[in-house]
Design a protein with these regions (language model features):
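Generic secondary-structure microfeatures
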Residues: 19, 68-71
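Elongated alpha-helical scaffolds
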Residues: 59-69
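Charged interaction scaffolds used for protein-protein
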Residues: 1-14, 42-53, 61, 73-165
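Active-site nucleophile-His-acid catalytic modules used for acyl/amide transfer and hydrolysis
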Residues: 56
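Alpha-helical structural motif
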Residues: 19-23, 63, 101
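N-terminal leader/targeting peptides and immediately adjacent processing regions
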Residues: 1-41
Length: 165
């Protein structure tokens, strides 16, 4: 089974990642706004989804944003963004492998109670969106959804959840 790390040591203190209301509140800083090149429409992605999608791409910057959000429940003891970034950089330099941290982050968001429903809805919507399209657009959406399922399985060693659409 793929190793899953949901704790991080910063300044000799261990912090456990939690998906809570405060996670979402902190994650709002990491929401993204992009413009679809094909349609010209503005695409807004909330912070939790933005972090999740970045984790799927094993983006270390999104891993730092995840830990910044996931330690927000510590309130007065929360490590700073810079402390988290330095720790993640040190782990990458020492071990050469952040994958267990990506696995832990993805599983926490996708499987633990607070954001489980939100992410199940995201998976459902990805699957359903391909069913509402026609021709090449439908094929492209289906390939994209399959790619994300494969990515999740490749990283975490298990399927995201049973998608019934």
């Amino acid at each position: 089974m793929t190793e899953s790390i949901t704790e991080i040591r910063i300044n000799d203190k261990i912090f456990k990642a939690k998906g809570t209301y405060l996670f979402g509140k902190t994650a709002k800083k990491y929401a993204t706004n992009e413009v679809d090149e094909e349609t010209g429409k503005k695409l807004e992605t909330d912070g939790v989804t933005s972090i999740f999608m970045g984790l799927m791409q094993q983006d270390p910057d999104k891993l730092i944003e995840f830990w910044h959000s996931a330690t927000s429940h510590y309130l007065k003891e929360q490590p700073s963004f810079e402390e988290i970034a330095t720790t993640i950089e040190d782990i990458a330099a020492e071990t050469g492998d952040l994958k267990p941290y990506f696995v832990g982050a993805l599983r926490m968001l996708n499987e633990d109670g607070y954001y489980k429903g939100k992410l199940q809805t995201l998976w459902f919507m990805m699957k359903r969106s391909s069913q509402n399209k026609k021709g090449e657009e439908k094929e492209k959406a289906k390939e994209s959804q399959e790619l994300f399922v494969e990515l999740y399985e490749e990283i975490t060693g298990k399927p995201p959840y049973e998608i019934k659409a």
